[in-house]
């Protein structure tokens, strides 16, 4: 910050001491548009974070699936010697989730960034620029109010130097012009930005739905194929509500093993 900017900041900080209610400038139309903008900014920022989180979570899910598949594969590898019904299911399951990760998830990464993340990010980048413009308006508003207060005091209590009032009035006129120009620009352009939000986000929303659909349908399609390698009897028991009882019987058998009580 320059020395001149520093002095202005100090003067603005003390403005509330010398600026009275009569000097303050109110613009309800701007206040309404600013509130609408802040609502848009909050939604846009949250959408950007959530969109990135969605892609990160997809990666996390598929990575976990691959890890689980590798563990299950190793478990069923041990059962091959006993000619288990599930001798090959671990292999098919691992192959399926790895193909899903490589052929689907990694392939949607680029399109998702291009059609969802990047456009949402570009829109959100404007928020910092608009925030700076609103901040600048607030500073110019304080400058304008200070000039109004200065003229008011000189009118109420004339100075010995007769030239002070004309100088103050000139400063007031310049401050008002600067403030009005920026204030009017924001009042005109903030509604335009807000109106653009739907047509801007629409293509990204459509792309998001299509990518989600592909992720879900291809994931379901691949995993559904694994069912043919599962024991048909177990599927029927699950459908008829009998599988829980079978699992309870197995747990009872495990508890009956002497090895489970060795640590007691």
Swiss-Prot record:
Subcellular location as annotated: Cytoplasm, Cytoskeleton
Up-regulation conditions: Expression is induced in absence of HOG1 under non-stressed conditions.
Alphabetical list of Pfam families matching this protein: BAR (PF03114)
A biological process term (GO) from this entry: endocytosis
Phenotype of the disrupted gene, per the record: Leads to defects in actin polarization, endocytosis, bud morphogenesis, as well as increased sensitivity to calcofluor white and Congo red. Also shows a strong defect of hyphal morphogenesis and attenuated virulence.
Keyword Cytoplasm assigned: yes
Keyword tags: Cytoplasm, Cytoskeleton, Endocytosis, Virulence
The keyword Cytoplasm is annotated on this UniProt entry: yes
PROSITE patterns, A to Z: BAR (PS51021)
InterPro entries hit by this protein: AH/BAR_dom_sf, BAR_dom, BIN3/RVS161-like
Cellular compartments per GO CC: actin cortical patch; actin cytoskeleton; mating projection tip; medial cortex; membrane raft; Rvs161p-Rvs167p complex
Domain BAR: 15-239
MF annotations from Gene Ontology: cytoskeletal protein binding; lipid binding
PANTHER family tied to this protein: BRIDGING INTEGRATOR 3
Physiological role: Component of a cytoskeletal structure that is required for the formation of endocytic vesicles at the plasma membrane level. Plays an important role in virulence.
The protein's name: Regulator of cytoskeleton and endocytosis RVS161
Organism from which the protein derives: Candida albicans (strain SC5314 / ATCC MYA-2876) (Yeast)
Taxonomic lineage of the native organism: Eukaryota, Fungi, Dikarya, Ascomycota, Saccharomycotina
Gene: RVS161
């Amino acid at each position: 910050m320059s020395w001149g900017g520093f002095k202005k900041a100090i003067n603005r900080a003390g403005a509330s001491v010398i600026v009275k209610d009569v000097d303050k400038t109110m613009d309800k139309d701007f206040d309404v548009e600013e509130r609408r903008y802040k609502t848009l900014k909050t939604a846009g920022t949250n959408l950007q974070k959530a969109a990135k989180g969605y892609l990160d979570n997809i990666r996390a899910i598929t990575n976990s699936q691959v890890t689980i598949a590798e563990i299950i594969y190793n478990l069923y590898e041990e059962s091959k010697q006993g000619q288990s019904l599930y001798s090959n299911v671990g292999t098919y399951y691992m192959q399926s989730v790895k193909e899903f990760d490589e052929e689907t998830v990694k392939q949607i990464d680029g399109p998702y960034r291009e059609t969802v993340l990047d456009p949402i990010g570009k829109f959100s980048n404007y928020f910092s620029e608009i925030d700076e413009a609103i901040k600048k308006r607030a500073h110019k508003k304080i400058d304008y109010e200070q000039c109004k207060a200065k003229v008011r005091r000189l009118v109420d209590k004339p100075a010995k130097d007769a030239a002070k009032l004309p100088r103050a009035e000139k400063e007031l006129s310049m401050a008002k012009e600067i403030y009005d120009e920026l204030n009017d620009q924001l009042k005109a352009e903030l509604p335009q930005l807000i109106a653009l939000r739907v047509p801007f986000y629409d293509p990204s929303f459509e792309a998001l739905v299509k990518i989600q659909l592909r992720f879900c349908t291809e994931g379901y399609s691949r995993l559904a194929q694994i069912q043919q390698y599962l024991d048909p009897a177990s599927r029927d028991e699950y459908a008829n509500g009998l599988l829980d009882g079978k699992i309870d019987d197995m747990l009872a058998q495990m508890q009956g093993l002497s090895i489970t009580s060795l640590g007691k």
